[in-house]
Amino acid sequence: MTCPRNVTPNSYSEXLAAPGGEERYSRSAGMYMXXGSDFXCGVMRGCGLAPSLSKRXXGGSPSLALNTYPSYLSQLDSWGDPKAAYRLEQPVGRPLSSCSYPPSVKEENVCCMYSAEKRAKSGPEAALYSHPLPESCLGEHEVPVPSYYRASPNYSALDKTPHCSGANDFEAPFEQRASLNPRTEHLESPQLGGKVSFPETPKSDSQTPSPNEIKTEQSLAGAKGSPSESEKERAKTADSSPDTSDNEAKEEIKAENTTGNWLTAKSGRKKRCPYTKHQTLELEKEFLFNMYLTRERRLEISKTINLTDRQVKIWFQNRRMKLKKMNRENRIRELTSNFNFT
């Protein structure tokens, strides 16, 4: 080994800030420097990468101080080729050869520690080192994070920044977002149409009376004029088609539901009134005398009030069920009134 050109023995005295003169450690954690008095020559230009040493008494051997880690050991790429095995190679010692540099070569401040972005921040440490290495060595020895090395020696310095620098990186997401826009417009278009169109069928139902309502109005007018004629008409319709009244009632219920049942808020089905007041009074009188009718008595009543035998029979059945229900409710009411629930 030969000493570098024109280096005074105590050129690194400013960097050693510890009180003892034999202190061999710089302020930075990753630098180890040996004093020039140990090797009978000036301070060596090569400074090796080594982990920070905590003890002051444990001094390194001259061979360790004179050697540096190889230039191809740098940080392993996180975005490198997945086929490359992530392994940590053992550092191999290599002596630093002395070389002369032309005056045109620009020399930097720090030998092998930080990248260009980090070197810009370390301006105050420029006066601590007299003859640093050129930029070619800086790129090879760059180790931003300790204990991570690159697997292959062919890669150059990590000059690329991890930030995205260009609009090409974002073209695919923007295209995907643009493809979603027509779908949202397609979904919004039927909603606008639904707000404008309203059904107008209830108006036609409410304005134009149904033929069933016309029939009922005519029958009521006839009942006012001559009750006997209305009874005859009802008897004829009941004899001819007993199911027509059911169909008419269902149609009336549908008409009420369409015309705005939400205004009246009626609950339950519409009650049918197939019997007139005169007919119901006659049937109630007979029910008071006898709850169960014989076939002969039933035929007599049906002839007097212009009803069929079947209609009278059904009316008495319904009346008995109604009476039974009323008796049950009255009985429950009487039982509950005797007990005082507190």
UniProtKB/Swiss-Prot annotation:
For the modification Phosphothreonine, the affected residues are T8
* Location of region: Disordered: 185-271
Question: Which positions does the record tag as DNA-binding?
Answer: 268-327
**Keywords linked to the UniProt accession:** Developmental protein, DNA-binding, Homeobox, Isopeptide bond, Nucleus, Phosphoprotein, Transcription, Transcription regulation, Ubl conjugation
Record-level Gene Ontology MF annotations: DNA-binding transcription factor activity, RNA polymerase II-specific; RNA polymerase II cis-regulatory region sequence-specific DNA binding
Q: Which residues carry this modification: Phosphoserine?
A: S189
* Entry annotated with the keyword Transcription: yes
In terms of SMART domains, this protein maps to: HOX
| Protein's UniProt keywords contain Ubl conjugation | yes
Query: Which Gene Ontology CC terms are recorded?
Result: nucleus
| Biological role stated in the UniProt entry | Sequence-specific transcription factor which is part of a developmental regulatory system that provides cells with specific positional identities on the anterior-posterior axis.
Under what name is this protein listed? Homeobox protein Hox-C10
